[in-house]
UniProtKB/Swiss-Prot annotation:
PANTHER family: PROTEIN TOLB, PROTEIN TOLB HOMOLOG. It is found in: Periplasm. It comes from Shewanella frigidimarina (strain NCIMB 400). SUPFAM superfamilies: TolB, N-terminal domain (SSF52964), Tricorn protease N-terminal domain (SSF69304). One of its GO terms (cellular component) is periplasmic space. This is Tol-Pal system protein TolB. Residues 1-21 form the signal peptide.
Length: 442
């Protein structure tokens, strides 16, 4: 068995071992270097207890982004402020934070609430402190109010996080996104579960339960469908499933391997790995007509296709050079060019949404880690420091990578920032979780 075949067998074995569905995020590195920000509890202007804590969600989002660290509310000079009108610059003169998030929540009819929030520029406030009277409204970076229903608190909290993140970084936030992943609970009649959840593990939903392995989930560009590989019929088949209607479509069921689906940027086609003509090769399948087009032709294994953002090329893993490496094939000319040369193996690659970086699994000295290559300079940086890393998936804003890894002998999910500075682990209770796929913007 050659090296790539052994790797594919290892991935299959890993995917068929034990899992828990609830995901938590434990930050392991990178907090000290993050940008400080203050988030105070939103003031509840109604009777009885507040229906939800928006500030807790916003603070957690910003901390998990790897860009910010939220300050302890107990150490803030004004922890009950609700708007810039109650802001006193002198009180914040010695607080090391660049911005402050404040807000209010009040009843607005049956099961509805008016949520207001403001983003205050603390840097500007501190520069102006001591210069006499000032107009606090000049300190506002953002101010919004929205009416939401009782079941929208968490969703709108993520929306606030998106707004704050983009205002302070210039990069669109990805807190309203979701992840898909595979859970395996051994001992059950149908131990293989295809799950989706909010990016932070909340609002988990099971899409499919099967007695046979499920693997390789991938999102459509519109975020409405998932493609995945199922062995429910005792053979590898590729399905596309609408996550809202639950409608499933069988796309590929040839003899042999049907694997590694990847949606084209227009959502109309899948790049897949098929062995119907002999060796595993890269094909493109039209989802509507099921028509197939062979893209590669080589005696070595070609697998793990991934599209470039312009839809004109496909990245894939091949052993045609003797060891697993990443290659690019043009869909116009079928010309193949090698992309990676450092390390022993490089595989499982994908291109960042902006087309500037390639994320992949690198094996050096027998250790598998997540790596990033700048496509302009070809500089490679190893991002992760965990073990047996696999299945990297990039956030739609290109700032974070979620991937599968091993922690204390169990398969778990982990995350790392694109600069490698911030690291987090998504621990589980019983069983294992793997094969993560980050959704597009929703």
């Amino acid at each position: 068995m050659n090296n790539l075949a052994k790797w594919l067998t290892l991935v299959l074995i890993v995917l068929t071992t034990p899992a828990r569905a609830a995901l938590d995020i434990v930050i392991t590195e990178g907090v000290d270097a993050a940008r400080p920000i203050a988030v105070v509890p939103f003031v509840w202007q109604g009777q009885g207890p507040a229906p939800a804590s928006i500030s807790d969600v916003v603070a957690s989002d910003l901390s998990r982004s790897g860009t910010f660290k939220t300050l302890d509310v107990r150490a803030l000079p004004q922890s009950t402020i609700s708007s810039v009108n109650g802001f006193t610059a002198q009180n914040w003169a010695n607080v090391e934070a660049e911005a402050l998030v404040v807000g209010t929540v009040k009843p607005y009819g049956a099961d509805q609430y008016l949520v207001s929030f403001e983003l205050i520029d603390l840097v500007k406030a501190q520069l102006q402190a001591g210069k006499g009277p000032q107009n606090n409204n000049e300190l506002l970076l953002e101010s919004r109010e929205t009416v939401i229903s009782a079941n929208q608190f968490r969703q709108y909290s993520h929306r606030i996080s998106d707004i704050v993140y983009e205002k302070l970084t210039g990069i669109r936030g990805a807190f309203l996104t979701r992840i898909a992943y595979v859970v395996v609970k051994q001992g059950q009649k149908a131990p293989y579960h295809l799950m989706i959840a909010d990016y932070d593990g909340y609002n988990e939903q099971m899409l499919l339960r099967s007695p046979e392995p499920l693997m390789s989930p991938t999102w459509s560009p519109d975020g409405r469908r998932l493609a995945y590989v199922s062995f429910e019929n005792r053979k590898a088949e590729i399905f596309v499933q609408d996550i809202y209607s639950q409608t499933r479509t069988l796309v590929s069921s040839f003899d042999g391997i049907n694997g590694a689906p990847a949606f084209s940027p227009d959502g109309k086609k899948l790049a897949v790995t098929l062995s119907k003509d002999g060796q595993p090769e890269i094909y493109v399948v039209d989802i509507a007509t099921k028509a197939t087009r062979r893209i590669t032709e080589h005696y070595a294994i070609d697998t793990e296709p991934s599209w470039f953002p312009d839809g004109k090329s496909i990245l894939f893993t091949s052993e045609r050079g003797g060891k697993p490496q990443l290659y690019r094939v043009s869909l116009d000319t079928n010309k193949v060019s090698r992309m990676t040369f450092e390390g022993e193996w490089n595989l499982g690659g994908s291109i960042s949404p902006d087309g500037r970086s390639m994320i992949f699994v690198n094996r050096t000295n027998g250790k598998f880690h997540i790596a990033r290559m700048d496509l302009a300079t070809r500089f490679m940086q190893v991002l992760s420091s965990t073990q047996l890393d696999e299945s990297p998936s990039v956030a739609p804003n290109g700032t974070m990578v979620i991937y599968g890894t091993t922690h204390q002998g169990k398969q778990v999910l982990a995350a790392v920032s694109m600069d490698g500075r911030f690291k987090a682990r998504l621990p589980v209770g019983q069983g294992e979780v793997k094969s993560p796929a980050w959704s597009p913007f929703l």
